[in-house]
Amino acid sequence: MTQRYLFTSESVTEGHPDKICDQISDTILDALLSQDPQSRVAAEVVVNTGLVLITGEITSQAQVNYVDLVRKKITEIGYTSAENGFCATSCAVLVALDEQSPDIAQGVNVAQESRQQLSDEALDRIGAGDQGIMFGFACNETPEFMPLPISLAHRMARKLAAVRKTHQLPYLRPDGKTQVTVIYEDGRPVGIDTILISTQHTPTIGEISDEAEVQAKIKQDLWTMVVQPVFSDLTVKPDQNTRFLVNPTGKFVIGGPQGDSGLTGRKIIVDTYGGYSRHGGGAFSGKDPTKVDRSAAYAARYVAKNIVAAGLAEKCEVQLSYAIGVARPVSIFVDTFGTGKIADERLLELVQQHFELRPAGMIQSFGLRHLPSDRGGRFYQDVAAYGHFGRPDLELPWEQTDKAALLQEALPKTLSGAVSV
């Protein structure tokens, strides 16, 4: 009997209050690492009507004008008029930063293995910045090895922002959310059940002032300018049975920080796999690479993606866990949900053999300290919106599949000939 079910994921635009905070936090990180790659950063941001608060702990030799960074980022996002309820030039910016705790720093500067002289390897000298668990995931539903629901939600959110910024739909304002419900049969996506877009907009559109007519205009424009282009190159498409919902409350004029306060780290499911995979709970934005919440989540994705790209599984989830001040993972767990071509225990052995999962090793392998300076002063702020994974537009080091050929060698000879990497 065919197993049929629905799965839903959401995304938000760069103008969503929480995403404003994520982007400001990572803009600060970019600026600090560009000048001082050894910066220790935990930058948290809060936004509300007319207010931006920067707080957290930073230890760095860099000289940064935080107020200027904030205003430039808010301008880039699109809040340039008081009519939006939040404006880059008029909002207040408060800065309340401390240095990193020396109790934490001592464990990160020199790892337990090195302090106790259990290992002399250079990569054992940087311990994890905190305890915690991190998950990475990959599946073969899309070319970028991401689940289809979150991939579609991100595509629509990016397109929604694009038609606003290019003035194709000039009545749109920066805040917006997208959501896609995908129909699955026997574990494979086969159709689209529901598409939902909530987008901030002006009270009137040209001479149209009636609320119902305004919403009808928005709905038609979004179908033509956003939904249809997003699905144009896909085999799974909406059909006559697909529900298309736009601003279901009736209107969305008040938005951004005026409508809701925002906070760094509140969109962790949007940042990752849209709920399709588990999440360890730690946010990414505003954290330097010694924070394993970020670097180990990137590494776990790298491991899972290479396993799927190698044809060793159709889907794969990797869990890593760390102790503060300890370089080596406390545990590694690999789960292929019954889709593995070889046993999960064998995959675990391959992960331990071929992947560097100590904080210093991950930082070095991906170049995490130097990516901002290597890419013109901005890197992390660009992954702070529209997902940290499955981003071919950004050439992310943890999205490489350079280990796939090596892993493929572990396939039984009867299977390896049927898989191409």
UniProtKB/Swiss-Prot annotation:
One Pfam family name is S-AdoMet_synt_M
GO cellular component entries: cytoplasm
Instruction: Report keywords, A-Z.
Output: ATP-binding, Cytoplasm, Magnesium, Metal-binding, Nucleotide-binding, One-carbon metabolism, Potassium, Transferase
Residues reported in the UniProt entry to bind ATP: H16, D175, G176, K177, K251, F252, D260, R266, K267, A283, K287
Which GO-annotated molecular functions does the record name?
ATP binding; magnesium ion binding; methionine adenosyltransferase activity
Could you tell me the superkingdom of the organism this chain comes from? Bacteria
Class of this enzyme? transferase
Please list the residues that bind Mg(2+): D18
In the record's cofactor note, how is the cofactor described as bound? Binds 2 divalent ions per subunit.
- Cofactor list: Mg(2+); K(+)
Task: List, in alphabetical order, the GO biological process terms annotated in this UniProt record.
Answer: one-carbon metabolic process; S-adenosylmethionine biosynthetic process
Entry EC no(s): 2.5.1.6
Catalytic activity, as annotated: L-methionine + ATP + H2O = S-adenosyl-L-methionine + phosphate + diphosphate
Task: Enumerate the residues binding K(+).
Answer: E44
Q: Where do the record's region annotations for Flexible loop lie?
A: 100-110
Function of this protein?
Catalyzes the formation of S-adenosylmethionine (AdoMet) from methionine and ATP. The overall synthetic reaction is composed of two sequential steps, AdoMet formation and the subsequent tripolyphosphate hydrolysis which occurs prior to release of AdoMet from the enzyme.
Q: What family name appears in the similarity comment?
A: Belongs to the AdoMet synthase family.
Q: Which protein, by its recorded name, is this?
A: S-adenosylmethionine synthase
Originating species: Cyanothece sp. (strain PCC 7425 / ATCC 29141)
Instruction: Tell me the classification of the organism that encodes this protein.
Output: Bacteria, Bacillati, Cyanobacteriota, Cyanophyceae, Gomontiellales
The primary gene name is metK
